[in-house]
């Protein structure tokens, strides 16, 4: 009840603000300016201004009273054909809203303030006391555009009035000054704020996106950049012209005229380059590391991986790793396909309908420079700038040269290291021949300077 009352306050305040900007300027600024007489010049100002005000109120009313679109009562997805539902990746079950106790179609979301699920939810707008969704998104964009048109024309009239006073040295009355100040103080912030908001929503309409889906695309881009999922394409972008037609109507001449939304809001056309019609049911892909039951890491996995257990193309496996792979029995990931909690973020569909988590590393390199990896297999070409992995031997350290060796010798005498405790010469080996490495304390020390003087 409290939320509904506050919603009425927001709507009432918006109506008062629009009315003040639209009518106070006509009654207290424009009408006295033209001597309170009807003329052609006066009509050229009042007719466009009142037309814009009428369209603003009309579209605003439609935004307030038009429902964004609810999920039809009793609507259930066709699980067998996966028609009209958005599946939860991994469990292959449709998205279900526990609060509303019904299934959720693609692009539908639950609004906590309205406490219901809306089709193609964009955001909850307090200024209209309603959510912006499938059936009123066009009304909302038209309302913003008409506010831009009306406030721009209003500011032009106010500036002309100020220039007229300055040019003809006409002494304005106190009422003229006050209402000029009040109109500028109210119209300029509205023009700036609504203007920026309009640009953003027109941008979303050109990409056939919503505010929520804009956040989802940013999150997906981050997952791709970090190599957690395969590169995927936003499925609903079908071209700028078709995108705008899907929101504002099929006739471009009537885009600013209120009209009924086409479609049912349960399914949407998909860009063929992003996949088939089923692609919309797998958007957005989720972070596989945050799933309740993440996929197990196969035994043959390497510590040097690049997303979804795939190899970084800039790293080459060592000979020891290749030998270990050839000797280690391979664990088939299909053994884990019975796990219900597995959530595949993306990938190719298998024959049994599941989604493979393995992927090629190339799609992850969209934001980075890509260098060809080294010749891991016969016949592969070799390029420059190939980073290599150095894998040292545990328990070895390289002794520094120069004065440090002398200081280390003095420390040997003080500590009392015994060479015989750390090294036993082989039979027939001269014990007085310098060795390139020896046991000092806990470490095997390798001295490259001694190696140069070592002779067999």
UniProtKB/Swiss-Prot annotation:
GO terms for biological process: establishment of protein localization to plasma membrane. Disruption phenotype: Displays morphological changes and shows increases in adherence to and engulfment by host macrophages. Causes dramatic defects in cryptococcal morphology, stress tolerance, and virulence. The chain crosses the membrane at residues 10-30, 38-58, 139-159, 177-197. It is found in: Endoplasmic reticulum membrane. The keyword Cell membrane does not apply. Residues 337-352 have a biased composition (Basic and acidic residues). One of its GO terms (cellular component) is endoplasmic reticulum membrane. It comes from the Eukaryota. This is Palmitoyltransferase PFA4. It comes from Cryptococcus neoformans var. grubii serotype A (strain H99 / ATCC 208821 / CBS 10515 / FGSC 9487). The gene is PFA4.
């Amino acid at each position: 009840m409290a939320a509904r009352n506050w919603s009425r306050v927001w709507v009432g305040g918006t109506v008062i603000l629009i009315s003040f900007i639209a009518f106070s300027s006509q009654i207290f600024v424009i009408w006295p300016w033209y001597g309170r007489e009807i003329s052609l010049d006066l009509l050229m100002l009042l007719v466009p201004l009142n037309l814009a005000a009428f369209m603003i109120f009309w579209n605003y009313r439609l935004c307030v009273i038009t429902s964004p679109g609810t999920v039809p009562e009793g609507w259930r997805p066709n699980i067998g054909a996966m028609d009209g539902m958005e599946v939860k990746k991994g469990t292959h079950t449709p998205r279900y809203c526990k609060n509303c106790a019904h299934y959720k179609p693609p692009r539908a979301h639950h609004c906590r303030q309205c406490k219901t699920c809306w089709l193609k939810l964009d955001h909850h707008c307090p200024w209209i006391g309603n959510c912006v969704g499938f059936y009123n998104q066009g009304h909302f964009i038209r309302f913003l555009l008409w506010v831009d048109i009306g406030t721009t024309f209003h500011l032009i009239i106010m500036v002309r009035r100020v220039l007229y006073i300055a040019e003809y040295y006409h002494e304005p009355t106190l009422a003229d000054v006050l209402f000029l100040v009040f109109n500028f103080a109210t119209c300029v912030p509205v023009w700036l704020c609504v203007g920026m908001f309009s640009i953003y929503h027109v941008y979303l309409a050109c990409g056939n996106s919503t505010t929520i889906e804009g956040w989802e695309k940013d999150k997906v881009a981050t997952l791709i950049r970090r190599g957690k999922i395969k590169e995927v394409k936003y499925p609903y972008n079908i071209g700028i012209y078709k995108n705008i037609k899907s929101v504002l109507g099929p006739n471009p001449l009537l885009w600013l005229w209120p009209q009924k939304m086409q479609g049912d809001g349960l399914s949407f056309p998909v860009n063929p380059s992003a996949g088939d019609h089923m692609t919309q049911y797998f958007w957005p892909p989720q972070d596989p590391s945050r799933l309740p039951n993440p996929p197990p890491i196969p035994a043959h996995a390497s510590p040097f991986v690049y997303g979804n257990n795939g190899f970084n193309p800039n790293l080459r496996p060592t000979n020891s790793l290749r030998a270990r792979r050839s000797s280690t029995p391979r664990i088939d990931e299909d053994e884990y396909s019975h796990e219900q909690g597995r959530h595949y973020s993306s990938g190719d569909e298998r024959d049994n309908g599941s989604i493979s988590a393995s992927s090629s590393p190339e799609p992850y390199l969209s934001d980075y420079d890509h260098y060809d990896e080294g010749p891991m297999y016969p016949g592969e070409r070799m390029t420059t700038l190939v980073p290599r992995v150095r894998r040292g031997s545990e328990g070895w350290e390289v002794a520094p040269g120069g004065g440090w060796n002398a200081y280390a010798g003095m420390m040997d005498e003080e500590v009392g290291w015994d060479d015989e405790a750390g090294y036993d010469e082989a039979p027939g080996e001269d014990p007085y021949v310098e060795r390139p490495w020896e046991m000092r304390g806990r470490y095997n020390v390798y001295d490259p300077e001694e190696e140069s003087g070592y002779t067999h």
